[in-house]
């Protein structure tokens, strides 16, 4: 955990949870943006709609979580949706490579997981899936850019409510 900047170990003093590092947050968003836009481009080239069924299954599970107000489960399915898209595009290893550096990005997301926020995420996922099924890579890329920029709103709220969680420059 120290290697991915979650824990800060100070010999003979103690072990502490690291503050959220905004440079690492932006780095993770940057890498995810590059990867996920390329994944969506690959998926837009798929002609066999049966290959996209795992994506549809993820959306179905997310909708059920929303209907039953299961936000924690929804958070896991949010990550699973992106992982599933990577798997369909045969880019699972690439997705796993960036997974460890997105921990600070995920911390911001987790701290602001309200019901209405989950509904917005679901709608964005549905829009991404629709663009993929329409073979519209540009539209999918634009939605992904907006989707991965949601954290900025979350970050502003977090800075106001819990500034002590954020690492100073």
Task: Identify the residue ranges that each predicted region occupies.
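Active-site loop of classical SDR/Rossmann-like NAD(P)-dependent oxidoreductases
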Residues: 117-119
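Conserved amphipathic alpha-helical segments that form helical-bundle/coiled-coil interaction surfaces
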Residues: 24, 28, 40, 45-110, ...
């Amino acid at each position: 955990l120290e290697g991915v900047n979650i824990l800060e170990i100070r010999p003979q003093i103690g072990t502490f949870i690291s503050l959220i590092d905004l440079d690492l947050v932006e780095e993770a968003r940057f890498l995810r943006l590059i990867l996920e836009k390329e994944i969506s481009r690959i998926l837009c080239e798929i002609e066999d709609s049966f290959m996209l069924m795992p994506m549809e299954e993820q959306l179905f599970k997310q909708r059920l979580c929303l209907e039953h107000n299961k936000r924690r489960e929804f958070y896991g399915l949010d990550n699973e949706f992106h992982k599933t898209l990577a798997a369909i595009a045969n880019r699972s290893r690439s997705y796993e490579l960036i997974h460890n550096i997105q921990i600070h990005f995920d911390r911001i997301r987790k701290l602001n997981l309200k019901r209405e926020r989950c509904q917005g995420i679901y709608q964005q996922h549905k829009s991404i899936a629709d663009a993929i099924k329409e073979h519209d890579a540009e539209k999918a890329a634009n939605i992904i850019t907006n989707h991965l920029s949601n954290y900025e709103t979350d970050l502003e709220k977090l800075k106001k409510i819990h500034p002590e969680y954020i690492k100073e420059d």
